[in-house]
């Protein structure tokens, strides 16, 4: 069987499984999620051993520390993965929710209900936790998950999927509700994203190159996620102590994730005081600052659009709020933008004008996260406007169906 047929066969099995999942009760899905969490914890030794092998291979090939951090699993991270499954079990089930409804003058009763999408394909890099996050959210929303991880996490992903499939079988549910496509054949991505009619949506998570390639080449509908050139704008009315805390948290908490700040914009009206203070704070935390000011790494045009994902940040002094918004419009990726200010009018103008999935006022960009938003584990952070935007939880993994109840109604000629 060639790769194309293998992917299509997996998609057909996923379709069959999805029909079973769509009819499960909330209690059945929640029980399956708790069983999956138990299975992941029970298999933690095997999962950690597989991950150690992936880490060793990646390190030997010269993988950067930021990418190793994305790849690495620890006992604490496995506990977090299991906890994420339990959190999803505790979330409201979107399937069957009435979005809107009415009774027409002729007596027909209309209801628009949430229903599963069907087969959800995921193409993702490095992070093995995405394997379980995708499974958990897909299962709770009644979808089958068809996963294509990166070769760098092949052993980790395989160990996780073995645990998940074992738990499904123990619950007498179809194991093909989650399948892992081969990561050693690049063509499997192409065949997945072009399996129109077999796969309902593909969600890419990873670097800009992966995401743009999937969106460009797919014939299956896609949801673009993740590339985050996020800005923190320190307004002229900012509390500089607050600005320092927010900037450091946005940049240094986990620099390898997509909601990290990559550029800080400082209002010219306070630059004389703000620049030295914020520079010292950043440099104390080992952040390399790129910019046009003396003593910084000279910035090039590419720095303003760079998603570093490292302890690097670009710094620019801007004339005012209008200039900050124009800079963000030009270089931002529509992910998360933040303003630090005590001026309510300025905050409202910033939130109204900035075009992004999330806009923060006096808060770290790190809060753009499904768990932080109360969604549980997220399937990704959408930076497009259709079909979802921002952190994608359970409702974003559903479509809708119109149910019309009549009593012998016929439409007049």
Swiss-Prot record:
Family: Belongs to the gamma-glutamyl phosphate reductase family.
GO biological process: L-proline biosynthetic process
SUPFAM superfamilies named in the record: ALDH-like
Name of the protein in its database record: Gamma-glutamyl phosphate reductase
Role according to the record: Catalyzes the NADPH-dependent reduction of L-glutamate 5-phosphate into L-glutamate 5-semialdehyde and phosphate. The product spontaneously undergoes cyclization to form 1-pyrroline-5-carboxylate.
Keywords linked to the UniProt accession: Amino-acid biosynthesis, Cytoplasm, NADP, Oxidoreductase, Proline biosynthesis
Catalytic activity entry: L-glutamate 5-semialdehyde + phosphate + NADP(+) = L-glutamyl 5-phosphate + NADPH + H(+)
InterPro entries: Ald_DH/histidinol_DH, Ald_DH_C, Ald_DH_N, Aldehyde_DH_dom, G-glutamylP_reductase_CS, Glu-5-SA_DH, GPR_dom
Protein species of origin: Rhodococcus jostii (strain RHA1)
GO cellular component: cytoplasm
Pathway the protein takes part in: Amino-acid biosynthesis; L-proline biosynthesis; L-glutamate 5-semialdehyde from L-glutamate: step 2/2
EC number in record: 1.2.1.41
CDD domains (alphabetical): ALDH_F18-19_ProA-GPR
Chief location of this protein within or outside the cell: cytoplasm
PROSITE patterns found in the cross-reference section: PROA
GO molecular function, one term: glutamate-5-semialdehyde dehydrogenase activity
Intracellular or extracellular location(s): Cytoplasm
NCBIfam families for this protein: PRK00197.1 (NF001221), proA (TIGR00407)
């Amino acid at each position: 069987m060639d790769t194309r047929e293998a992917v299509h066969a997996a998609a057909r099995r996923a379709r069959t499984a999805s029909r079973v999942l769509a009819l499960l009760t909330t209690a059945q899905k929640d029980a399956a999620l708790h069983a999956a969490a138990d299975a992941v914890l029970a298999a933690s030794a095997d999962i950690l051993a597989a991950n150690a092998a992936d880490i060793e291979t990646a390190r030997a090939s010269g993988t950067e520390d930021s990418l190793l951090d994305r790849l690495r699993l620890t006992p604490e991270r496995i506990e977090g993965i299991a906890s994420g499954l339990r959190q999803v079990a505790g979330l409201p089930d979107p399937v069957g929710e009435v979005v809107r409804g009415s009774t027409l003058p002729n007596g027909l009763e209309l209801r628009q209900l949430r229903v599963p999408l069907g087969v959800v394909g995921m193409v993702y890099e490095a992070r093995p936790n995405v394997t379980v996050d995708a499974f958990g959210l897909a299962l709770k929303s009644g979808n089958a998950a068809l996963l294509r991880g990166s070769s760098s996490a092949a052993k980790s992903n395989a160990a996780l999927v073995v645990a998940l499939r074992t738990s499904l079988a123990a619950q007498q549910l179809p194991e093909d509700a989650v399948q892992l496509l081969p990561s050693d054949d690049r063509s499997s991505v192409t065949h997945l994203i072009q399996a129109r009619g077999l796969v309902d949506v593909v969600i890419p998570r990873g670097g800009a190159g992966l995401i743009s390639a999937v969106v460009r080449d797919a014939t299956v509908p896609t949801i673009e996620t993740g590339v985050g050139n996020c800005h923190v704008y320190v307004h002229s009315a900012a509390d500089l102590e607050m600005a320092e805390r927010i900037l450091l948290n946005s940049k240094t908490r986990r620099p390898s994730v997509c909601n990290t700040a990559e550029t800080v914009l400082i209002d010219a009206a306070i630059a004389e005081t703000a620049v030295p203070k914020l520079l010292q704070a950043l440099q104390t935390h080992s952040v390399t600052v790129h910019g046009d000011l003396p003593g910084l790494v000279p910035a090039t045009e590419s720095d303003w659009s760079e998603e570093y994902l490292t302890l690097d940040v670009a710094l620019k002094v801007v004339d005012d709020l209008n200039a900050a918004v124009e800079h963000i419009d030009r270089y931002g990726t529509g992910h998360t933008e933040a303003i630090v200010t005590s001026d309510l009018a300025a905050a409202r103008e910033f939130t109204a004008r900035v075009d992004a999935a999330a806009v923060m006022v006096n808060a770290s960009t790190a809060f753009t996260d499904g768990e932080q938003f109360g969604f549980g584990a997220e399937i990704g952070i959408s930076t497009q406007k259709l079909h979802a935007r921002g952190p994608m939880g359970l409702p974003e993994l559903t479509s809708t169906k119109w149910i019309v109840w009549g009593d012998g109604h016929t439409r007049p000629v």
